[in-house]
Amino acid sequence: MLVKWEGIVIRSVDYGESSKVVTMFTRENGKLGVMARGAKKTKSRLAAVSQLFSHSYYLCKAGPGTGMPDLSQGDMLDSFRDMRQSLTATAYAAYIAELLDRLTQEREPNPYLFQLLLHTFRHLDEGRDAEILCRIFETKMLIVAGISPQLTACANCGEQREPYAISVGQGGLLCPVCLPSDPYAMAVTPSTWKLLRLFQVFDLERLGDIEVKPATRNQLKHVLRSFMDEYLDLRLKSRSFLEQLERMERMTQSDQD
């Protein structure tokens, strides 16, 4: 049986001398793995559509009892060429793709996540702020994972009393009265927790230019990574590379200053 899916490649692994196992996130069926036979050959009609980040329509042979579907052909919609040509944007895209891959199961339809990934890649391709796009994506993936921070009131007492700190252990904001309950709570500026709260409900399709101070960027990253490290315990290869790249960029900026 031939089936047609709209998907974005989030992982591609060599298989044998000439083929690839391609993992795509589809609009219709969520995450799927397909066999792209001969895709490693230079002249293969599957070479382009099986590349990482490719957004295409895919025609596959699938059916009950047939195992992994075979990719028959693809119709490229967007290769995100400009994103690929930027080392920074590519590094963030790889991290975003791996994070999505690790936090989703196969064949669980989620059109919202497909749209989130698509709009994130489109914004990266347009040269938007890759770091902020990544923070927005991380915030929304915490919701998917069921560990989204409580950011509307104190997670301990439910009262709305500022200034807030953020407690990973208690799952969100802590008011001044409850702050002693967690000696490891993180002091954050109002801008940080308000941006995180905005990111939780923000429609990425409407993204404009967002100006975020370096100190706030650092706090956003620290809070989100702390929640992921505490509750998800992910070991992402792309995150290690991204952090190396960020360190190099900070060193370059420091030398220029």
Swiss-Prot record:
Q: Which GO terms describe its biological process?
A: DNA recombination; double-strand break repair
- The regions listed as transmembrane in this protein's record are none
Entries under Pfam families matching the protein: RecO_C, RecO_N
Gene3D superfamilies the UniProt entry points to: Nucleic acid-binding proteins (2.40.50.140), Recombination protein O, C-terminal domain (1.20.1440.120)
InterPro entries assigned to the protein according to its UniProt record, in alphabetical order: ARFGAP/RecO, DNA_rep/recomb_RecO_N, NA-bd_OB-fold, RecO, RecO_C
Q: Any idea which UniProt keywords this protein has?
A: DNA damage, DNA recombination, DNA repair
Q: SUPFAM superfamilies under this entry?
A: ArfGap/RecO-like zinc finger, Nucleic acid-binding proteins
Report the GO terms under cellular component: bacterial nucleoid
Is NAD set as a keyword in this record?
no
* Annotated function: Involved in DNA repair and RecF pathway recombination.
Which family does this protein fall into? Answer: Belongs to the RecO family.
What's the protein called, per UniProt? DNA repair protein RecO
Organism annotation:
Brevibacillus brevis (strain 47 / JCM 6285 / NBRC 100599)
